[in-house]
């Protein structure tokens, strides 16, 4: 976060939610996202970068990591050449007691391929939707003919593929069967932030000590709540997610 007004607002929200910011503030402000939503609820984002595109390896190395921590790095974090090097190399050097979640995100085509080659071998979980998976596979294949996303990952690492209203598909290892995690039925009002919500809920499940299959079911519940109302905010609470898991019923959390 920076010193500007947008950073101030985000910091206030984080403090209100009990989230500690571990990195020092930078001079400047965070970027801005303009979201375009069509009548069917499909969302497209236009992003301008800010201080978040200037991570420092020195600052990252000062973060105190503890056993059981989860680190999430998204493709959108690595679209800047400097950020791609700093984040991918830091993530690749994370200690084994930290779970690294890498999300491919719509910005996949803007990430230098070297960053993917650096970060994927360390990833414990790679999450993506169908389009993102296809785009990344094409990029890697063009770089090294015949290679796939799995070619760069450890055999024991997991992949999560989000498939919209069909939920998500989980593979716990290279030779493991694909497990379909069902979605929850919901009327879609707005898809803004649904991918981010799914990833965040999954990471929360991992932090709580759940197995990845349970964490993905939590993620599906959170995603269903996220699309039940207009706007990416507010994000679902733990109580709301638990209620969906218990009842199977999704209601608009703004009503």
Residues of each region from the PLM?
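Ribokinase/PfkB-type carbohydrate-kinase core domain
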Residues: 3, 8-25, 37-178, 182, ...
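Conserved post-catalytic alpha-helical subdomain immediately downstream of the catalytic base
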Residues: 154-158, 183-253
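Short alpha-helical
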Residues: 5, 29, 187
């Amino acid at each position: 976060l920076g010193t500007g007004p947008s950073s101030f607002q985000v910091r206030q929200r984080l403090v209100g939610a009990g989230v500690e910011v571990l990195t020092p503030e930078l001079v400047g402000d965070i970027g801005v996202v303009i979201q375009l939503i069509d009548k069917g609820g499909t969302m497209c984002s236009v992003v301008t970068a800010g201080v978040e595109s200037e991570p420092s390896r020195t600052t990252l190395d000062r973060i105190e990591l503890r056993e059981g921590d989860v680190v999430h790095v998204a493709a959108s974090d690595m679209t800047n050449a400097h950020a791609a090097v700093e984040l991918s190399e830091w993530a690749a050097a994370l200690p084994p007691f930290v779970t690294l979640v890498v999300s491919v995100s719509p910005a996949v085509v803007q990430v230098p391929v070297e960053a993917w080659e650096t970060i994927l071998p360390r990833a414990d979980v790679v999450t993506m939707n169908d389009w993102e998976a296809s785009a990344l596979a094409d990029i890697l294949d063009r770089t090294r003919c015949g290679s796939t996303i799995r070619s760069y990952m450890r055999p024991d690492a997991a992949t999560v593929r989000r498939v919209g209203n069909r939920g998500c598909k989980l593979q716990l290892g290279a030779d493991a069967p694909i497990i379909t995690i069902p979605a929850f039925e919901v009327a879609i009002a707005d898809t803004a932030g649904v991918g981010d919500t799914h990833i965040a809920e999954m990471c929360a499940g991992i932090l709580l000590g759940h197995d990845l299959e349970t964490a993905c079911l939590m993620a599906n519940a959170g995603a269903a709540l996220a699309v039940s109302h207009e706007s990416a905010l507010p994000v679902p609470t733990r109580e709301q997610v638990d209620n969906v898991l218990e009842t199977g019923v999704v209601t608009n959390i703004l009503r």
